[in-house]
Amino acid sequence: YFLELKNSNLFLISIFFLLFTILWVFPFLGFGSPIALLGGFIFGKWIGTVLVILGLSIGATFLYIFGNYFLKDLIREKFLNKFQNLENKFKKSEFYYLLIYRFLGGIPWQISCLLPTLFNVRITNFFFATLIGIIPQIFLAVSIGSGLEKIIEQNSKVPNISDIIFTPTIYI
């Protein structure tokens, strides 16, 4: 039933998913992995990647704007002394530094969205660096979600984690 619904209402589901992704990031301060897995499961590898990247970038930009207006003093108080030496470098080429910052994995999503308020990054630079910088991580997670859909369709029972990890459909 779910697959029929998914195939018949792809545009509507895409709009709801995009809105849900934006809401997931901004007010709830969620991270992107569950959304990326769900996007791959529902939409497949390519459409899921585009929707998740767009939704997470918009949500992250809203979170950055919120932090810039309401949390800037608190963030500067907590973190400025640790990142004082980067402030001048960031101002010279903020897009490239932010892009490298977004390519790095392992930084909690909330911190990676709020920390650039220290350097007064322009909103357009933040949005486009986020849009480009999260592509590799999100593509991998969406591919895993897409592979999960294929594994679930093929098996009548719930697969083990080792079955999921070593299935070639996840990586292709």
Residue locations for each model-derived region?
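Short amphipathic alpha-helical surface patches that mediate protein-protein
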Residues: L80, I132-G133
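A sequence-composition feature that detects small, non-aromatic residues
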Residues: A36, A60, A129, A141-S143, ...
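Membrane-interfacial helix-loop-helix
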Residues: Y1-L19, I53, S57-L114, L118-N125, ...
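Transmembrane helix boundary and interhelical junction motifs in multipass membrane proteins
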Residues: T21-I42, W46-I47, G106-C113, I134-L140
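Interfacial segments of multi-pass membrane proteins
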Residues: A36-I58, T117-F128, I132
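C-terminal membrane module of polytopic membrane proteins
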Residues: G133-I172
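Short amphipathic alpha-helical segments
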Residues: I111, I123-L131, F139, S143
